[in-house]
Each structure stands twice: as structure tokens, then as C-alpha cells.
């Protein structure tokens, strides 16, 4: 009788502080599909919430108790006794078993597990790669030369695509373990041990923190220009009178005046206007505005969950599409201004081949960087056999987008009267603060970056604190210290080195050295060697890729 009484108890214990209660108090989290497997019941025993509850069969109840018993033999983190994939029904046939003897089909489960079509997968990859690097592509083409720049963009796209292909195929080359749920750091750990795990973590943090620094510099820039636009509009000030610029309906300015360094001053001096002097004192691009952002963004970084900010991801796509629109419109208005000189520079034009082309390769390494999360993106592809095809199409679209933006901005830059060397590391800086189209672009990008910045901070927290303490939120003190370090780095760079092109190329070459060039090539060499299929051409080709990655990083320090 004791056994009968124990069998009649509820199989799912009560949980307090329930966040998302399901029907009949069922606890369900669709984000962890493997550790919380639903129990399958024949369709004859399935009911809706509003239907009369029908008891399940004795066989189904006994099977549920058996699985419940097995789950108690190990800790929840141990996957040893979880039912394997081949015995689990399809997602649309999975149901959650209630202790009251009924089964419910939860929409959140099937929706959370739904696969993406190839079109959605391609768009996701394109959208993920479209970041701040797009603002520096025209500057990179100027540094490399027009012809060389276009060739470098295409070649870097092909090289990073191949390395990304090797990342996608890396799991399938491991036959001794079940790699279904593995991410790329797990593959690195398999081949290189703890060194591979921690080194991949280090380089991933480099890319994240580098991106956050670039975001802080750009947000300071956009916030400064936004405030300057409003002030100039109210006081009827024309800011193109004090810098080298074109005199037409679509003005273009040269804030660095050929010095190669961005203008860090706020605005012009008006000796007779105390109000303007006061505004300039408290609204300076490098001395005050970066500190104003601390009050806006530091509290957002301390949120436990970034789910609210993830709702604004669509703004990234809108911003890129608007940049394409504004570049197209400006090119139509300005026309093309090109002259071809292969090696010798002229007063207004740069040569087609320049020794500074590694600066563009550094920028492009980050611009094409998706290698640390490509496995995750492709996991949800409905047709896994199309992964390689979809990846190639996405890379082609990204390459065409970079070429379109870079070529149009460079070719339409009005030379003369302005030299091509005036193209800024952020090409929006070549448009005056009073330009309405640029003002809208800066507003959109500023808001979009303010929503993405907490997400990047959350990812950095997950990777660093999660690995060190085993908890992504050990305490408010730990989180605050980490966020202060990240914010401090951003403020420091915005004040003393506000060159987004330089920051992008250094961080891109550093993180790309591991994730793009070394790890994919070494893993392929080791796997082929273990299978005794390694040939000299394969070995030499992948060693050349590693050498190119090292040369790319070293060259950044000599440019």
C-alpha cells in the first residue's frame, strides 16, 4: 500500500515564485529543449485546456513514472539518462504530461523549436554581420586605394567565407562524441583542451569589448552632433563656414583638413557670443559628451536580463537600409569624381595601390566576423543540407553591401575641391551637423546602439563571470566592477583615441587571428591527420592562412 500511495503522488513538485505559469501549473521553459524533455502521449489522450479532462492510459502513466524515476538517478545537469533524439517525437507531436493525468500541447514549445527557412537564415547572417564596420569601409578603401580596396574586399570575403565554412564543418569531423549541442568553443576544447576553451573565451571577449569601445566612441560622436544640430538650428548658425567644404545644396566637409586625424573640437569660437562659448565648453566631443553617456548607459548594464533590449534588434536593419538610402541619394546629387593614378598621389586623388592596405584588411576581419556564433545561427535552419549554400549567399550579400557603400561614398566624394584624403573613419563625419539626412541617420544609429550596448555587456558578463564564478550574476558588486571597467575603457578611448577605424582594425585583427585564421585551420589539419587524410597541399594551404592572419595582426602596428 505504501508503494501505491507513493505512486499516486504528484510527479511534478510545486514551485514557488512561478514566473510563467502554464496550464494546470505546469512549469515549462522552451529555451532548454534538451534538459526538459516533454513526455509523449498518444493523440487519443490529448485534451485542450477548455475540454473535459480525460485520464491517460495506464501504459502512458507507467511510462511517465519510469522516466520520472530515471531522472532522479542523476543530477539535472547530467545528460546521461535523457532520452536520445531518435526516440523523441517530432516537436509538433510533443506534449507535456500533467500530474493530474492529462496531456497538454503548449504552443510556446513548438514555436520555440520552430526552424527557420533558408531566406530567414540568410537574412539573420547578413543582419548579424552588418555592424559599425560599415561606417569605416569608405575610409578603408581610401587607405588601400580604390582598385586595391575593391579587390581586398572581395578577397577577404572569400577568405573569411572559407574559414567560416571550416567552422561549420568542424563538428561533423568529430565522430567520437555527440556534437549535436556543441558550440565552437566546445570544438576548440575538444582539440586543444582547457587552453582552447580559455583562449577562445579571451579572443571572444576581445571582440566584444572592442565592439563596446567602438560603440561608446560612436555614441559620443552621434550625441555630440545631435546636440550641435539642435543648438545650431535654434541659433541659426551655419557650421560649414569654418571648415573646408563644398558650396552646393549637398555640402560635404573636411573636418580633419587632410591631417589624417578626426576633429575633436566641438565647434567654432564666437568672441561676441557668450552663450555659444558656454555651449562649447559644456558640449565637447572628447571632453564632456563621453561622460554624459555614463549616466544613461551604466544603469542599463546592471540589468539581470537584457530581454527588453533584444526587442529593438530590428533597428539595426532599419539603420543599415537607411545608410544605403542616404549614400545612394548623396551619390546621385554629387556625381562621381574619379581619376586613376596607379602609384603617384595627386593633390586631390590617392593612388590605386597604397601600402596602407592592411588597415582595410584589419577592418574587414571584423566586418566579416561571425565565426564565433555561426554554428548557433545555422542550428535553426530547417534544411541543414543547405547550410553551406545559405552561408555562401549571406557572405555574397554582405560583400556586395560593403562594396556598394564603400564604392559609392569614395567615388562620389567631391574631389576637387576636397581631396580624397578627407574621407573620415566614420564617413558620416564628412557631412555637416546641419545636414538633415545625416542628422536622422545619427539619431537612428544612436538609439540603436544604446539598445545593443547593454546586450554586448550582458554577453561579456555571461562569458567572463559565468566561466570564473559559474554564475552570470554572482552579486551586484561583481557586475558593477566589470561594467565600470568596460565603461571606463570606452570613455578613455572616446577622450584620447576617438578613431573608430583604428579601434576596429586592431580588435578585428586580434580576435580574427584566433577565430578566423588559426583555430579553423588548425582544427582541420588535426582532424585530417587523425583520419590519415592529410596531404601536403592541404597542409601548406592552411599554414598559409595562419601566416596571413599573423601578418594581418602584425601589420596593424606598422601602419
Swiss-Prot record:
Belongs to the amino acid/polyamine transporter 2 family. SLC38A9 subfamily. GO terms for molecular function: active monoatomic ion transmembrane transporter activity; amino acid transmembrane transporter activity; arginine binding; cholesterol binding; guanyl-nucleotide exchange factor activity; inorganic cation transmembrane transporter activity; L-amino acid transmembrane transporter activity; L-arginine transmembrane transporter activity. Lysosomal amino acid transporter involved in the activation of mTORC1 in response to amino acid levels. Probably acts as an amino acid sensor of the Rag GTPases and Ragulator complexes, 2 complexes involved in amino acid sensing and activation of mTORC1, a signaling complex promoting cell growth in response to growth factors, energy levels, and amino acids. Following activation by amino acids, the Ragulator and Rag GTPases function as a scaffold recruiting mTORC1 to lysosomes where it is in turn activated. Disulfide bonds join 254-422. It catalyses: L-leucine(in) = L-leucine(out); L-tyrosine(in) = L-tyrosine(out); L-glutamine(out) = L-glutamine(in); L-asparagine(out) = L-asparagine(in). A motif (CARC motif) lies at residues 442-452. This is Neutral amino acid transporter 9. The cytosolic N-terminus part of the protein mediates interaction with the Ragulator complex. The cytosolic N-terminus part of the protein destabilizes the LFC and thereby triggers GAP activity of FLCN:FNIP2 toward RRAGC. The cytosolic N-terminus part of the protein mediates interaction with the Rag GTPase heterodimer in a RRAGA GDP-loaded state dependent and upon arginine binding, leading to the GDP release and SLC38A9 dissociation from the activated Rag GTPase heterodimer. The CARC and CRAC motifs mediate binding to cholesterol. It comes from Rattus norvegicus (Rat).
Amino acid at each position: 500500500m505504501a508503494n501505491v500511495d507513493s505512486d499516486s503522488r504528484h510527479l511534478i513538485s510545486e514551485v514557488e515564485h512561478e514566473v510563467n505559469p502554464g496550464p494546470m501549473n505546469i512549469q515549462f521553459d522552451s529555451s532548454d529543449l534538451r534538459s526538459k524533455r516533454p513526455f509523449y502521449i498518444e493523440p487519443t489522450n490529448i485534451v485542450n485546456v477548455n475540454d473535459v479532462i480525460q485520464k491517460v492510459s495506464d501504459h502512458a502513466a507507467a511510462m511517465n513514472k519510469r522516466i520520472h524515476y530515471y531522472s532522479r538517478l542523476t543530477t539535472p545537469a547530467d545528460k546521461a539518462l535523457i532520452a536520445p533524439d531518435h526516440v523523441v517525437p517530432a516537436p509538433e507531436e510533443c506534449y507535456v504530461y500533467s500530474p493530474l493525468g492529462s496531456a497538454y500541447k503548449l504552443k510556446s514549445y513548438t514555436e520555440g523549436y520552430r526552424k527557420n527557412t533558408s531566406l530567414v537564415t540568410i537574412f539573420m547572417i547578413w543582419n548579424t554581420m552588418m555592424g559599425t564596420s560599415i561606417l569605416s569601409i569608405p575610409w578603408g578603401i581610401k587607405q588601400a586605394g580604390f582598385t586595391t580596396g575593391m579587390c581586398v574586399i572581395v578577397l577577404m570575403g572569400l577568405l573569411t567565407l572559407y574559414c567560416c565554412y571550416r567552422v561549420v564543418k568542424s563538428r561533423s569531423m568529430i565522430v567520437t562524441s555527440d556534437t549535436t549541442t556543441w558550440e565552437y568553443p566546445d570544438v576548440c576544447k575538444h582539440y586543444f583542451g582547457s587552453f582552447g576553451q580559455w583562449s577562445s573565451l579571451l579572443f571572444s571577449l576581445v571582440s566584444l569589448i572592442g565592439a563596446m569601445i567602438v560603440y561608446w566612441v560612436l555614441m559620443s560622436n552621434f550625441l555630440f552632433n545631435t546636440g550641435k544640430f539642435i543648438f545650431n538650428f535654434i541659433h541659426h548658425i551655419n557650421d560649414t563656414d569654418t571648415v573646408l567644404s563644398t558650396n552646393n545644396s549637398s555640402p560635404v566637409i573636411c573636418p580633419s583638413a587632410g591631417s589624417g586625424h578626426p576633429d575633436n573640437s566641438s565647434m567654432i569660437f564666437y568672441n561676441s557670443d557668450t552663450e555659444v562659448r558656454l555651449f562649447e565648453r559644456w558640449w565637447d566631443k572628447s571632453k564632456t559628451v563621453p561622460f554624459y553617456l555614463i549616466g544613461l548607459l551604466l544603469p542599463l548594464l546592471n540589468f539581470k536580463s537584457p530581454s527588453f533590449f533584444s526587442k529593438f534588434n530590428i533597428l539595426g536593419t532599419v539603420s543599415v537600409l537607411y545608410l544605403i538610402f542616404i549614400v545612394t541619394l548623396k551619390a546621385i546629387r554629387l556625381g562621381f569624381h574619379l581619376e586613376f593614378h596607379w602609384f603617384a598621389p595627386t593633390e586631390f586623388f590617392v593612388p590605386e595601390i597604397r601600402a596602407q592596405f592592411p588597415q582595410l584588411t584589419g577592418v574587414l576581419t571584423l566586418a566579416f566576423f561571425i565565426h564565433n556564433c555561426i554554428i548557433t545561427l545555422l542550428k535553426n535552419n530547417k534544411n541543414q543540407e543547405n547550410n553551406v549554400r545559405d552561408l555562401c549567399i549571406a557572405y555574397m550579400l554582405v560583400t556586395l553591401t560593403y562594396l556598394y557603400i564603400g564604392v559609392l561614398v569614395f567615388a562620389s566624394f567631391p574631389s576637387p575641391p576636397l581631396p580624397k584624403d578627407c574621407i573620415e573613419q566614420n564617413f558620416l563625419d564628412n557631412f555637416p551637423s546641419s545636414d538633415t539626412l545625416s542628422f536622422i541617420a545619427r539619431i537612428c544609429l544612436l538609439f540603436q546602439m544604446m539598445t545593443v550596448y547593454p546586450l554586448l555587456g550582458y554577453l561579456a558578463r555571461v562569458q567572463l563571470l559565468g566561466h570564473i564564478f559559474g554564475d552570470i550574476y554572482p552579486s551586484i558588486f561583481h557586475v558593477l566592477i566589470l561594467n565600470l571597467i568596460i565603461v571606463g575603457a570606452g570613455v578613455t578611448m572616446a577622450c584620447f583615441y576617438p578613431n573608430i577605424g583604428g579601434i576596429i582594425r586592431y580588435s578585428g585583427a586580434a580576435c580574427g587571428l584566433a577565430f578566423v585564421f588559426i583555430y579553423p585551420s588548425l582544427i582541420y589539419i588535426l582532424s585530417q591527420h587523425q583520419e590519415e587524410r592529410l596531404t601536403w597541399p592541404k597542409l601548406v594551404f592552411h599554414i598559409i592562412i595562419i601566416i596571413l592572419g599573423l601578418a594581418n595582426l602584425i601589420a596593424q602596428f606598422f601602419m
